[in-house]
């Protein structure tokens, strides 16, 4: 059967142009369908806010078009279907039927599907931005047909299909962007480790980061501050030391080591005579992020971890995203029993009253009792943030002389201590070493960092030691202590001749603790 239109005529040439236009239009619709629909709304918003300059421009042009995804999908598919259905009709006019079928399949497959989709997959953002005005015209032309269909799809499938990554997927996504993954990412090992640690910190509680109470260095309330005690504190190298009353688990407060600088060791002043601070108590089920937020308030950088004996075991609850979360009916304030927190009636008025004192009273130059004050001036709240306003924390002082020894509920068993450094180490996923730490790998006993020698003790201790004679202090060791300097320090072999005023563990920590366990060298000093 011969073709209806003779070759090489004007009509023949017009049909050829129409065929080429149909193939190009079908290919453009197929490429835009794959390229634009593969760009999620979340991805475009990320590019608009934090992409490269050119990507921001391209994403800004595409986003209004892609916003109604079902309408765009229907428009592109309708245009593609019309072009592919019309192509065989025009081919059949200029070539035999068998050749029309062959050419139609070949042209549609190669130039209408494979090539445009390959190009738009690679350069979808750029091509989509260039063709955005043309797509807007198509949306208007095909609106009467595509709009009803898109509404049906919205009703059946819902609007928008933007998918956010779950926590586990986000961690894997970050690891893939690390330079060690070999996938072209430029994130360093430290960056990926910290990001992963920040994501994992949500699922960790105080029990995961605390130091067991048996490994915590602490002092008894009636401990005399003699040479032996001061040497022990100095060799431990911590900035804060918990203080207990009779039982090591009955921790009532803490003492700042810097407050002992002026102590005369020859007078053997009892520890209860020194200025001590209250210590917060946290539940072992309290999330680390909540603990970190409490530490940032400045009341204390160390807390006692307790276990509620009356609390029944609760099974983990699996949420929709697959993450196991603990059922916890207690609020954060109930879990964090901050004994050094300001009373409610005194604390809640700080915002308005401080503003009144720092601005209103400053203008008048008068104090609360009406007396004139010299040098008073206007002070801005911005210069003194609320979280720094009570840095002195006078209400955190523990007055042993005028108040009874703090007592705590019998159903709360102290199981450990936790410091800000413990939380930061969980965030960094690395141990933090300081000048006084000696870390020994608990698996192969390889020393990593040596403890400072006894010769490096403060000169005041050395001078007192040189003036004394006839006695030798026993070997001093430390348990895992509380403070900012070394929160995960494990004990070395304790001295057999230690006074009962200084607590000492009787067993070596198991391998279930941190893989890098801190130790301290035994130090002996002649008195």
UniProtKB/Swiss-Prot annotation:
Chain ranges passing through the membrane: 16-36, 71-91, 94-114, 127-147
Annotated gene: CBSDUF7
Name assigned to this protein: DUF21 domain-containing protein At1g47330
Biased composition (Basic and acidic residues): 358-369, 518-527
One annotated GO biological process: magnesium ion homeostasis
Record-linked Pfam families: CNNM
Extracellular side: 1-15, 92-93, 148-527
InterPro entries referenced in this protein's UniProt entry, alphabetically: ACDP, CBS_dom_sf, CNNM, Ion_transp-like_CBS
């Amino acid at each position: 059967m011969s073709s209806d239109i003779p070759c090489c005529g004007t009509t023949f040439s017009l049909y050829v142009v129409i065929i080429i236009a149909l193939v190009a239009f079908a290919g453009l619709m197929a490429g835009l369908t794959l390229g634009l629909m593969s760009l999620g709304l979340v991805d475009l918003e990320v590019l608009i806010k934090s992409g490269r300059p050119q990507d921001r421009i391209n994403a800004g042009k595409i986003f209004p078009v892609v916003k109604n995804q079902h309408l765009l999908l229907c428009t592109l598919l309708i245009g593609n279907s019309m072009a592919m259905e019309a192509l065989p009709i025009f081919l059949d006019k200029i070539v035999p039927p068998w050749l029309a079928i062959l050419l139609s399949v070949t042209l549609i497959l190669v130039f209408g599907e494979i090539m445009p989709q390959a190009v738009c997959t690679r350069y979808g953002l750029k091509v989509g931005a260039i063709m955005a005005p043309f797509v807007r015209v198509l949306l208007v032309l095909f609106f009467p047909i595509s709009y009803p269909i898109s509404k049906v799809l919205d009703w059946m499938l819902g609007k928008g299909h933007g998918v956010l990554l779950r926590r586990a997927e986000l961690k894997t996504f970050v690891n893939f962007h690390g330079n060690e993954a070999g996938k072209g990412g430029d994130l360093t090992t430290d960056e990926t480790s910290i990001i992963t640690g920040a994501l994992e910190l949500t699922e960790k509680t105080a029990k995961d980061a605390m130091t067991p109470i048996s490994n915590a260095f602490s002092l008894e309330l009636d401990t005399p501050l003699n040479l032996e005690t001061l040497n022990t504190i100095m060799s431990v190298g911590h900035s804060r030391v918990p203080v207990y009353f009779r039982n090591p688990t009955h921790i009532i407060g803490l003492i700042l080591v810097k407050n002992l600088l002026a102590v005369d060791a020859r007078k053997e002043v009892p520890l209860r005579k020194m200025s001590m601070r209250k210590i917060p108590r946290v539940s072992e089920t309290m999330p680390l992020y909540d603990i970190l937020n409490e530490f940032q308030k400045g009341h204390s950088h160390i807390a006692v971890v307790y276990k509620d004996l009356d609390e029944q075991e609760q099974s983990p609850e699996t949420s929709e995203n697959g993450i196991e979360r603990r059922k916890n009916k207690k609020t954060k304030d109930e879990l964090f029993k901050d004994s050094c927190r300001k009373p409610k009636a005194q604390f809640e008025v700080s915002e308005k009253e401080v503003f009144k004192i720092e601005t209103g009273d400053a203008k008048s130059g008068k104090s609360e009792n009406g007396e004139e004050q010299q040098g008073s001036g206007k002070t801005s709240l911005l210069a003194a943030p609320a979280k720094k306003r009570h840095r002195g924390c006078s209400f955190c002082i523990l007055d042993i002389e005028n108040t009874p020894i703090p007592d705590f509920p019998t159903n709360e068993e102290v199981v450990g201590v936790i410091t800000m450094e413990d939380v930061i180490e969980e965030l960094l996923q690395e141990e933090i070493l300081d000048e006084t730490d000696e870390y020994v790998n608990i698996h192969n006993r390889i020393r990593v960092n040596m403890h400072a020698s006894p010769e490096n003790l403060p000169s005041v201790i050395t001078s007192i030691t040189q003036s004394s004679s006839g006695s030798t202090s026993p070997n001093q060791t430390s348990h895992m202590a509380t403070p900012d300097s070394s929160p995960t320090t494990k004990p070395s072999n304790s001295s057999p001749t230690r006074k009962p005023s200084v607590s000492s563990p009787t067993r070596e920590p198991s391998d279930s603790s941190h893989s890098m366990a801190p130790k301290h060298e035994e130090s002996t000093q002649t008195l």
